[in-house]
Amino acid sequence: MASSNPPPQPAIGAPLAPSAPGPSPEVEEDSGEAFEFDDSDEEEDTSSGLVVPGLAPERDTEPSLICFDTVPGSDLDPAAAPPQTEAPTVVSNGDAVGAAISGVRRSSWKRKSSRRIDRFTFPALEEDVIYDDVPCESPDAHQPGAERGLVYEDVHRAGAPRETEDLGWSSSEFESYSEDSGEETKPEAEPTKHRGSFQPKLSPDLTRLKERYVRTKRDILALRVGGRDMQELKLKCDCKMTQLMKAAKSGTRDGLEKTRMAVMRKVSFLHRKDVLGDSEEEDMGLLEVGVTDIKPPAPELGPMPDGLSPQQVVRRHILGSIVQSEGSYVESLKRILQDYRNPLMEMEPKALSARKCQVVFFRVKEILHCHSMFQIALSSRVAEWDSTEKIGDLFVASFSKSMVLDVYSDYVNNFTNAMSIIKKACLTKPAFLEFLKRRQVCSTDRVTLYGLMVKPVQRFPQFILLLQDMLKNTPRGHPDRLSLQLALTELETLAEKLNEQKRLADQVAEIQQLTKSVSDRSSLNKLLTSGQRQLLLCETLTETVYGDRGQLIKSKERRVFLLNDMLVCANINFKPSNHRGQLEISSLVPLGPKYVVKWNTALPQVQVVEVGQDGGTYDKDNLLIQHAGAKKATAAGQAQNKVYLGPPRLFQELQDLQKDLAVVEQITLLISTLHGTYQNLNMTVAQDWCLALQRLMRVKEEEIHSANKCRLRLLLPGKPDKSGRPISFMVVFITPNPLSKISWVNRLHLAKIGLREENQPGWLCPDEDKKSKAPFWCPILACCVPAFSSRTLSLQLGGLVHSPVNSPLLGFSAVSTSLPQGYLWVGGGQEGAGGQVEIFSLNRPSPRTVKSFPVAAPVLCIEYIPDPEEEAEGAEESRAATDPSVTVHPTVCLGLQDGSILLYGSVDTGTQCLATCKSPGPQPVLCLRHSPFYLLAGLQDGTLAAYPRTSGDIPWDLESPPMCITVGPGPIRTLLSLEDAAWASCGPRVTVLDAATLQTQQSFEAHQDEAVSVTHMVKAGSGVWMAFSSGSSIRLFHTETLEHLQEINIATRTTFLLPGQKHLCVTSLLICQGLLWVGTDQGVIVLLPVPRLEGIPKITGKGMVSLNGHCGPVAFLAVAMSILAPDILRSDQEEAEGPQAEEDKPDGQAHETVPGPDSHTARELTRKKGILLQYRLRSTAHLPGPLLSVREPAPADGSALEHSEEDGSIYEMADDPDVWVRSRPCARDAHRKEICSVAIISGGQGYRHFGGAPGGLSGRAAPCSETDSTLLIWQVPLAL
């Protein structure tokens, strides 16, 4: 098979002929310093690799400096291969090429060299790997001199000119590397012609690339056996490494970019494997950062210098937390590879196949590479912290690359699949389960494999929290502040994308799991597999069945799936063969349940029914209700009155109180027949007993109602009875907490609205794959209403604001389904005529007009001014607290065309105008904004009028002449109030004023065209988006440095919706909950995602375009927002404990802190002693007659009570007996997250659905004509 006398080996860097002979005996004696090579990539079918007989691969050999997957020889014809070569070489693009270096020479070299070097195995052969992104470097790539350009840029033949072209790999080439390279190879006995017949003809670039690989591989072999210039080469490598580390330490983007590009070019001294056995084929070009002789030092802060400010001390501590957190994270990634992956790959017999190991640990190595590089740069930055104090740019440079997103996306999308493989292996392979248990026991912290693998999913939220803390302690003007804001934006955007991809992956997994539990022939299976279903909500709820008297019959956990058009309920079916084994497995990795579908129904037929609901949503007379588990159906009206769905204990206590009240009433009648007069036994005392019992009953009913905050009652359609009457059955689910119930009610309501024609679809997501759908958080068009009740006049819209008012009369579900509570104030008018103000109530699912009144001139702008306590919790709140007699209510300000400013109270819609004034001039009031110090009015002549805040009933001093500041010669189109500044636009320039003194700080040009004016400004995070009077572009500016950061052309988002439309202008802007709403003069509304945190609100996504719009320009975009009452969020346990805890306190201690651990014991003692049955009567000392008692009479002290307050609880409920207090503020509610109900309102002429004809939808009458002023209201899902 081989010849044993190979000719001499050429020198390093010399061109090698295709038939270059092997090394000579002289070279064999002086082996020099040998290079180590990696083992071949591990595959499940290990027999596919070409291994020299008798030479097994060594696992502990030193990894190579540079890795090659194959040894191609592209310059020879495959048919010319010697007949002895049974396994033809397969190059990376899949071509089978005959070996120019014959099998005779290969095996001879192997026998000669194996006597003095480590054992070596040729890499496993691969196929179906296509390099599809290889750029052509020079037109003369095939000239003989081109072969000398190797990957080693410092290794060249003496006297030969160095190639000037860049032979490295770019990041885009590595990102386009095919992931199919990890596929198993076919048996080597397959004929070459069969392989080659399926491969395309090689391009010249690929041919040149293969030749270069052959040359490089041969020179590496020459280095291995020669090695005479090794010392010189190592010195050059170390020098180059030092230069690159200095570049990384420089802290500039250029230095970091040079380091990254050096690594991407596979610089030899940076390419060394630290993780043994990690030879996956899915390499993305991210190389290990361990160096040959230089190991990067661990990041460590030096001693704290003297004289640091408190903020600098805090920043050092935060930096230490970042270093510690990153070190722990990198160690966890190494543990995954070293403690789990590598042993599983090397285990014989294998507990998990190599293919499954690659799937389970997919992209872990690449994630480790990213963070190892970040740790090197972090180490250099930490060493220089006291002189630079910069770290934001390091985060930007490390995590803004698409490669990081791709690696993490692959890992996150594969996470569910990896856990599924681990779960299945635990159930079917005891050796694998034993391996996991042993590894967990051996670890110091006892963290499971799942606990380690979930850390990459949680990594970026941890970074965000640390950077937020760092940004809070970085003052303005600090060189690191803008970098930190950009870093926060990059991490937030990355985390949002990963969360969305994780949500989609989990959604697909849940639907697939549900589909497996349905028969293939069922209609539900066809619906689930059609690809048209979107999972909106999925949760495990407890289904309960109650009897007629409220007793709990049974309960069982169900998995409930809310799809975009149906509701599915399934049993959670656990069938473990060994219950104990199941528990052991669940402690190592979460087990996914198997489902058995119980029922499913179309979403429009599902109704949410609340306890005490009047039944207006369904017809009681023609409906029978059968409770789940009941054998007999009852009429809806009877069932509504008889069934109580509270806890059995509360229901029993309520019934006992009802019986006791009947007995006490009989006692009262008997007392009225007494002939004597007694101080503590008379009709006054008896009536007080009755009132006290009635109050206890009301409290008990409220407790039952509070318990129902976690009860979701669904009315579902059933089969009709024998007479044909429809039967609906009631299903009661217990949710984990009130938030869960709110979420279910809200999503059910919005999902029904989403099935309307105007929302099918409601948004278009332009994407390359044409498969993306509107996400579940997408706003849904709830209604379309005329802006003005009077249609006789053609009124133009001027502005709109929302005045939030919480209504305590709304029920629990009404809060979840209605629009944000409060009132909409809509202003407008007609040119040359008067104005009109319309007030809508939003305390229902659709708005309705409650008041309309005229004003002297058309309304041009409206501003809502909240309570000072609502607006700011600092100085304003303390100012109001110092003068309790001053009550400042929310107000609404109107700016008119005739220069008038009108002030109205916003709480009571019947309130008359509180104050009015005229602007200087008088000039039309184009815009209004309020700040903590002034009410600012932008006028037509470029003057800014400022009305100072007062401490009277009217919050602004409108009687005195305002402070006037000339901003520019043109009109002030828009104003923006920031924390410490006010921005005013005049033409293309924006002037920045101090918020307190209104002194001009600076000004800048937002647009280069003098004829263009800034028309809109909205703030988000640390940036301000601006729109202009002409053009379709919007621009982003930094609030602190005023730097222009980004420009977006809206026209590119609407070209497919409005083909041929060349001129587009932005007419309105709004930012709300991470979404930038853009209205155009064509009636089209564009939605763009922006970050929500304190970073820079850059736009990175493609956004969405609404198919619902206006026939004319979008006049304004406004937000309606209200916060749900805190008592709604209290769970049933807290509600049950709340009144009971208050019962144990005297009246003067009702608002103290939560009782200690002995409160439960005190309640039990009170219950055993009994309740003092008193309501209004605190003492009977003032009543006539003797005291009926065997004890001595009490001292004649009128202030003394007959009983101690600790014995009773009735009179502590409220000071006024006629007022029923629902709940008192609780300390545990202080930390609760606020839940905002949000709706977006757009105003313009008419309504248009861009998927159909203008003015309406097919088959439905248009709500208004094309010329009427119209409001479109979008409802946003609750952010829980």
UniProtKB/Swiss-Prot annotation:
Source domain of life: Eukaryota
Disordered: annotated segments: 1-94, 161-202, 1133-1163, 1186-1207
Coiled coil residues, start to end: none
Residue span, DH domain: 314-501
Gene3D superfamilies referenced in this protein's UniProt entry, alphabetically: Dbl homology (DH) domain (1.20.900.10), Pleckstrin-homology domain (PH domain)/Phosphotyrosine-binding domain (PTB) (2.30.29.30), YVTN repeat-like/Quinoprotein amine dehydrogenase (2.130.10.10)
GO process terms (BP): positive regulation of stress fiber assembly; SREBP signaling pathway
Record-listed Phosphotyrosine modification sites: 131, 152
Compartment(s) of residence: Cytoplasm
Residues with Phosphoserine modification: 40, 279
Biased composition range(s): Low complexity: 78-89
Pfam families from the UniProt entry: PH_19, RhoGEF, WD40_2
Cross-referenced SMART domains: RhoGEF (SM00325)
SUPFAM superfamilies associated with the record: DBL homology domain (DH-domain), PH domain-like, WD40 repeat-like
Ranges of Basic and acidic residues composition bias in the record: 183-193
Gene Ontology, cellular component aspect: cytosol
Alphabetic keyword roster: Cytoplasm, Guanine-nucleotide releasing factor, Phosphoprotein
Role: Acts as a guanine nucleotide exchange factor (GEF) for RHOA, RHOB and RHOC.
Summary of subunit composition and partner proteins: Interacts with RHOA, RHOB and RHOC.
Protein's recorded name: Rho guanine nucleotide exchange factor 10-like protein
Source species of the chain: Mus musculus
